[in-house]
């Protein structure tokens, strides 16, 4: 399929075209067409590919318990989108962990390596989705708030890294509150315009950021983030409770109608 086709594979464009042509399609069907037409897929890791959001809670709890510190629910939620350095800064500055920030960051990395190897699991259906997208020629990468060496180690240990061309991490402590990591991933593909890519996320912050930057977005349910599911379903272009459901929905849609493909 020509590269130019993917440039216009976006919900708003498909919807507008269908309205102009008098074609009646359910919004979710239009979104599935947009996802079918994407040529680049950018995946979050924690809570999206791996059941590891809860693992990070364990990392936090083990470190804080060691120093007799506690964390509020609000602080825990805010921590979800931070980098290792951002988390270390929170632990030291806000929670009073008696370490320097670099020392705390190294402790977090050590605990995370253990957690990914011993506690994290692959979310059901992920392998099938990656295989299906690979078969369609979709180029894939991972963009995470977790550092690249940890991403690669975690995905390699679970047999997933082979599907991805590369992994990128957030370079600013605010993590996915800014679109830098998604744009970095896009540019690594050699692409400039976000409408050519779809971002898969479990975080409402990540989804909102990616969507505002122009990416198509798919929200994936993750139990530790359940309280944010209503927000995710309202913000993401498409949302699915399981990877199996998402894949089934796309497969059931069938081929994109020729008149839409040709117009795009």
Predicted feature residues:
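N-terminal helical cap/lid subdomain that shapes the substrate entry/recognition surface
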Residues: 26, 33-128, 134-136, 149-152
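Positively charged N-terminal leader segments that act as targeting/secretion signals
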Residues: 1-7, 17, 22
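Conserved SAM-binding loop
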Residues: 49, 140, 199
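Residue-level detector of anion-binding/catalytic polar loops
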Residues: 70, 139, 216
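Asp-based, Mg2+/Mn2+-dependent phosphohydrolase catalytic module
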Residues: 4, 17, 27-39, 131, ...
